[in-house]
Amino acid sequence: MSQLTHINAAGEAHMVDVSAKAETVREARAEAFVTMRSETLAMIVDGKHHKGDVFATARIAGIQAAKRTWELIPLCHPLLLSKVEIQLQAEPEHNRVRIESLCRLTGKTGVEMEALTAASVAALTIYDMCKAVQKDIVIGPVRLLAKSGGKSGDFKVDAHD
């Protein structure tokens, strides 16, 4: 099993030193789901929400969150992201919204946390915009779908999960 990279020999948390790592193209994708009543989802899809375009706001929030991940997650490095993309899709058959984020850069550390943060904050934004009409909205699951680049190799979630 791999060792925890953010814990030193004394058991103390620290930020990993990436200065000796090679710069490679790194990419990560994550997803989040927001489940709600069919009436709430219809209001979003039909553009009838009194707060405005829920998907556009969630998309911008997710992009902004990816860029600020290093301020939210204590041991993350500040990164120069070259791409952040947020896709939102209504899934009326499940009364939910599926959010998929993509983050990319050429650098010395991965972008998994940025992708996860982007999807999570986009989901939280949907909740925030819809909580006046429905308080029992459910967020989750949130998960990493894939990552590529870097020394640890590629990862892709099993298609059956």
UniProtKB/Swiss-Prot annotation:
CDD domains attached to this UniProt entry: MoaC_PE
Transmembrane segments: none
Active site: 128
Pathway entry: Cofactor biosynthesis; molybdopterin biosynthesis
Transcription as UniProt keyword: no
Keyword Aminoacyl-tRNA synthetase (UniProt): no
Catalytic activity: (8S)-3',8-cyclo-7,8-dihydroguanosine 5'-triphosphate = cyclic pyranopterin phosphate + diphosphate
Catalytic EC class: lyase
Entry EC number(s): 4.6.1.17
Homology family: Belongs to the MoaC family.
Summary of the function given for this chain in its UniProt record: Catalyzes the conversion of (8S)-3',8-cyclo-7,8-dihydroguanosine 5'-triphosphate to cyclic pyranopterin monophosphate (cPMP).
Subunit structure: Homohexamer; trimer of dimers.
Protein name (Swiss-Prot/TrEMBL): Cyclic pyranopterin monophosphate synthase
Native organism: Salmonella typhi
Phylogenetic lineage: Bacteria, Pseudomonadati, Pseudomonadota, Gammaproteobacteria, Enterobacterales
Gene designation per UniProt: moaC
